[in-house]
Amino acid sequence: LFCGESGSTLRFLLPVAGALGVDVTFHMQGRLPQRPLAPLDAVLAAHGMTLRRDGALLHAGGRLRPGAYALPGDVSSQYISGLLMALPRLAGESTLTVTGGLESAGYIAMTEDALRLSGICLQKDARTYTVPGGQTAQLPAQCRVEGDWSNAAFFLCMGALSPVGVTVTGLAAASSQGDRAVLDVLRRFGADVRETQDTVTVRRGALHGVTIDAAPIPDLIPVLSVVAALADGQTQIVNAARLRLKESDRLESTAAMLRALGAQVEVHGSGLTVTGRPTLTGGTVDPQHDHRIAMAAATAACGCTAPVTVRDRACTDKSYPRFWADLAALTAVPAAETTKPDEGA
């Protein structure tokens, strides 16, 4: 099973393979073999699976047994989502206890919503899920897939940097998606944010620095750092240690992206300090094969006095293949120039 650099593909389907009792070889690329998997590996091995690594390959076999499972909540919510998908298929009832701090809780809530929509029964008591076995998921004949707040955030942040503003449609106001919090952060920055039932419009206001807790919204930090770089005063981004475990070390790659465009930013152990300026200079950004860094750099072009060139534009295909086409449709002139991996900048 080819995973590419997709952590969610690996972490979701590894326990599902164990629930089905099938032998699977997962093929990983990029930084995925280095991203943390040990807590999930240990739990799966303790409940009947056999796991063997061979470079970028992970060989999995065996069948998961019902029982008491426990996973940390402060490494990756994808561990928990993957097990919640797998446990209903086991032969008997299981429990899953989330230990330690819980980060990215919104993604787990989305998993619960999807499972219940599919007819799966589970109970949650504080930090423990009770999941009956012998269940089969069955989606309704028709169901509506929500708009993606994580990808919409780039355009909403462009709106916060533009007096004209940007309107995004198809976003569920009552969504469980954690990255819906982008609106709250933009309001705190001072942006003009207006919502209807499924439409959001964001325009520039008198932007000022804020403090951002990265723990529940790690994927928003690159693009929110761009807004911080164009806001008055300092912005402190805290509790961001997990960003070092993404497709790139996102603390360092976010800082490198901002510096390449003329921003003032400092990296400390688990966060960033960004000092805003009225404009950025523009320049060339190497996103380090990280889709969110590339899209954040394109967002920054809204506040630059010269063009932004983004190398390796294809890295955005991982999460948003139409990003550059949608950006071109939105702007009268290209907001950022892009190059393929084998092209010069």
Q: Which functions belong to the PLM regions below?
A:
Residues 1-345:
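Short, structured segments at the rim of ligand-binding sites
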